[in-house]
């Protein structure tokens, strides 16, 4: 069954569920679009996993769960993929309870028991440390992130996890690229897979190809018990918020622009940049032979089209899972 046939079947089923009144055309259309959303997200996550070999046979994946929409969606999709994957891997969900005032400690354990996922709650009062060290009114995100990262690395070792999965998505990656360009003066993004600072862990980002707007819709449809992210009382990261607003505006006014920016991260041409550590500019000499990559930038229209313009997440599905039944 191809995607079109599967979508049609889902729509037909939604039109007349047993024992219930037939759905209106609007409800049928919503069901159809929701089914497409589910399939798109699962496909994009599967594609990212395949492209970067994020999960391998026998892995134990530690899914870091914060209680936000992104980490809930990541866990939900990984569980779906595991059911149909041609490899065996384990999943353990981990939440770091940082003892923020008002944090609903019961929410995540109840949810994880409901879905039947092994989990571990790590209790560490990093909230008090951050509040003591960071002046009032300043953002605590940077220090909090460093403390949280160190704890999660330790927990991964204690649990025997071979991969640490974080819930960063496409928008996070593009935001980081822009932040580094505008405020750091360097071309640096957020990799889909990396070795941790201590050299002992592999960190993966299965949502790397997924748009934040899709995750927002997904979380609403799945009715995840979202925990607010502002319990710490920290001021928001204004620079990142600025980049987020910029990306949202571009997505609305210039469809495809953000996708092309994201796609560019996987199509780097060092010979047409200025980093001498990536390309031997100083030793470059005329060889007398034509170089197809020489000054091609001056000859071709820079706007991509067709296959070249496709975002990484739009590539063909990987073999980790069949999507017909999703």
Curated annotation (Swiss-Prot):
Disulfide bonds: none
Binding locations of [4Fe-4S] cluster: 141, 144, 232
Residues spanning the signal sequence: none
Claim: tRNA-binding is one of the keywords in the record: yes
Residue ranges of coiled coil: none
GO CC, one annotated term: cytoplasm
Gene Ontology biological-process annotations: tRNA thio-modification
EC number: 2.8.1.-
Annotated compartments: Cytoplasm
Cofactor binding notes: Binds 1 [4Fe-4S] cluster per subunit. The cluster is chelated by three Cys residues, the fourth Fe has a free coordination site that may bind a sulfur atom transferred from the persulfide of IscS.
GO MF annotations, alphabetized: 4 iron, 4 sulfur cluster binding; ATP binding; magnesium ion binding; sulfurtransferase activity; tRNA binding
Residue numbers spanned by region Disordered: 1-26
Cofactors: Mg(2+); [4Fe-4S] cluster
Tree of life domain: Bacteria
Keywords: 4Fe-4S, ATP-binding, Cytoplasm, Iron, Iron-sulfur, Magnesium, Metal-binding, Nucleotide-binding, RNA-binding, Transferase, tRNA processing, tRNA-binding
Principal location listed in the UniProt entry: cytoplasm
Catalytic activity: cytidine(32) in tRNA + S-sulfanyl-L-cysteinyl-[cysteine desulfurase] + AH2 + ATP = 2-thiocytidine(32) in tRNA + L-cysteinyl-[cysteine desulfurase] + A + AMP + diphosphate + H(+)
Motif stretch (PP-loop motif): 66-71
Catalytic class of the enzyme: transferase
Role played: Catalyzes the ATP-dependent 2-thiolation of cytidine in position 32 of tRNA, to form 2-thiocytidine (s(2)C32). The sulfur atoms are provided by the cysteine/cysteine desulfurase (IscS) system.
Miscellaneous note of the record: The thiolation reaction likely consists of two steps: a first activation step by ATP to form an adenylated intermediate of the target base of tRNA, and a second nucleophilic substitution step of the sulfur (S) atom supplied by the hydrosulfide attached to the Fe-S cluster.
Family label: Belongs to the TtcA family.
Quaternary context: Homodimer.
Descriptive protein name: tRNA-cytidine(32) 2-sulfurtransferase
The species this protein was found in: Burkholderia orbicola (strain AU 1054)
Gene: ttcA
